[in-house]
Amino acid sequence: MLKRTEKHIARKNNLSIFYIQTEDLPGQIGTIGCIFGKHNITIRNIEFINEKKDEEVLIKFAVKMPSDMSKEKIMDELQRVNGVKKVTGQ
Protein backbone atom coordinates (compact mmCIF):
# COMPACT_ATOMS: atom_id res chain seq x y z
CA MET A 1 0.00 0.00 0.00
CA LEU A 2 1.10 3.53 -0.69
CA LYS A 3 1.83 5.75 2.24
CA ARG A 4 -0.28 8.90 2.55
CA THR A 5 2.55 11.13 1.26
CA GLU A 6 3.15 8.86 -1.75
CA LYS A 7 -0.57 8.95 -2.60
CA HIS A 8 -0.54 12.74 -2.47
CA ILE A 9 2.51 12.94 -4.74
CA ALA A 10 0.99 10.46 -7.19
CA ARG A 11 -2.25 12.48 -7.39
CA LYS A 12 -0.40 15.80 -7.67
CA ASN A 13 1.74 14.50 -10.53
CA ASN A 14 -1.22 12.75 -12.18
CA LEU A 15 0.47 9.36 -11.82
CA SER A 16 -1.20 5.97 -11.94
CA ILE A 17 0.11 3.05 -9.90
CA PHE A 18 0.19 -0.55 -11.11
CA TYR A 19 1.16 -3.54 -8.97
CA ILE A 20 2.23 -6.56 -10.99
CA GLN A 21 2.84 -9.98 -9.43
CA THR A 22 4.92 -11.93 -11.92
CA GLU A 23 7.27 -14.82 -12.33
CA ASP A 24 10.89 -13.66 -12.24
CA LEU A 25 11.68 -14.22 -15.92
CA PRO A 26 14.49 -12.76 -18.06
CA GLY A 27 13.19 -9.76 -20.00
CA GLN A 28 9.96 -9.46 -18.02
CA ILE A 29 10.52 -5.78 -17.12
CA GLY A 30 11.22 -5.07 -20.80
CA THR A 31 8.06 -6.84 -21.91
CA ILE A 32 5.96 -4.86 -19.45
CA GLY A 33 7.75 -1.63 -20.43
CA CYS A 34 6.99 -2.27 -24.11
CA ILE A 35 3.28 -2.50 -23.34
CA PHE A 36 3.40 0.82 -21.51
CA GLY A 37 5.42 2.38 -24.35
CA LYS A 38 3.04 1.12 -27.02
CA HIS A 39 0.29 3.15 -25.34
CA ASN A 40 2.44 6.29 -24.80
CA ILE A 41 2.63 5.63 -21.06
CA THR A 42 5.75 6.98 -19.36
CA ILE A 43 7.29 4.99 -16.50
CA ARG A 44 8.23 7.38 -13.69
CA ASN A 45 9.31 4.84 -11.06
CA ILE A 46 9.77 1.10 -10.62
CA GLU A 47 9.98 -0.51 -7.19
CA PHE A 48 10.43 -4.16 -6.29
CA ILE A 49 8.11 -4.57 -3.31
CA ASN A 50 8.27 -8.19 -2.31
CA GLU A 51 9.85 -11.42 -3.40
CA LYS A 52 7.45 -14.07 -2.11
CA LYS A 53 9.35 -16.92 -3.68
CA ASP A 54 12.55 -17.13 -5.65
CA GLU A 55 10.45 -17.47 -8.78
CA GLU A 56 8.03 -14.55 -8.23
CA VAL A 57 8.27 -10.81 -7.57
CA LEU A 58 5.80 -7.98 -6.89
CA ILE A 59 6.67 -4.85 -8.88
CA LYS A 60 5.15 -1.39 -8.38
CA PHE A 61 5.11 0.87 -11.43
CA ALA A 62 4.31 4.59 -11.13
CA VAL A 63 3.36 5.78 -14.60
CA LYS A 64 2.04 8.87 -16.38
CA MET A 65 -0.82 7.90 -18.68
CA PRO A 66 -2.49 9.84 -21.50
CA SER A 67 -5.74 11.38 -20.22
CA ASP A 68 -7.86 9.36 -22.66
CA MET A 69 -6.26 6.00 -21.76
CA SER A 70 -8.32 3.37 -19.94
CA LYS A 71 -6.49 1.93 -16.95
CA GLU A 72 -8.61 -1.23 -17.22
CA LYS A 73 -7.50 -1.76 -20.84
CA ILE A 74 -3.84 -1.60 -19.80
CA MET A 75 -4.44 -3.91 -16.84
CA ASP A 76 -6.12 -6.46 -19.13
CA GLU A 77 -3.21 -6.34 -21.56
CA LEU A 78 -0.62 -6.67 -18.78
CA GLN A 79 -2.53 -9.64 -17.34
CA ARG A 80 -2.04 -11.50 -20.65
CA VAL A 81 1.77 -11.28 -20.46
CA ASN A 82 3.38 -14.70 -20.03
CA GLY A 83 4.32 -15.17 -16.37
CA VAL A 84 2.14 -12.38 -14.97
CA LYS A 85 0.01 -13.73 -12.11
CA LYS A 86 -1.91 -10.64 -10.98
CA VAL A 87 -2.30 -6.97 -11.94
CA THR A 88 -3.90 -4.35 -9.70
CA GLY A 89 -3.96 -0.58 -9.85
CA GLN A 90 -4.55 2.56 -7.83
Protein language model annotation of sequence segments:
Residues 15-16, 58, 67:
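General secondary-structure edge motif
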Residues 52-59:
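A short, glycine/Asx- and small/polar-enriched loop/turn
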Residues 25, 64-69:
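Helix N-cap motif at beta-to-alpha junctions
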Residues 44-47, 80-90:
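Conserved short beta-strand edge segments in small beta-sheet-based binding/regulatory domains
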Residues 18-20, 60-63:
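Short cationic amphipathic helices and targeting signals
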Residues 1-48:
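Canonical alpha-helical transmembrane segment with a positive-inside/aromatic-interface signature
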Residues 31-36, 70-83:
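Short amphipathic alpha-helices in soluble, non-transmembrane regions
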Residues 63-64, 74:
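Long, continuous compositionally biased terminal/linker segments
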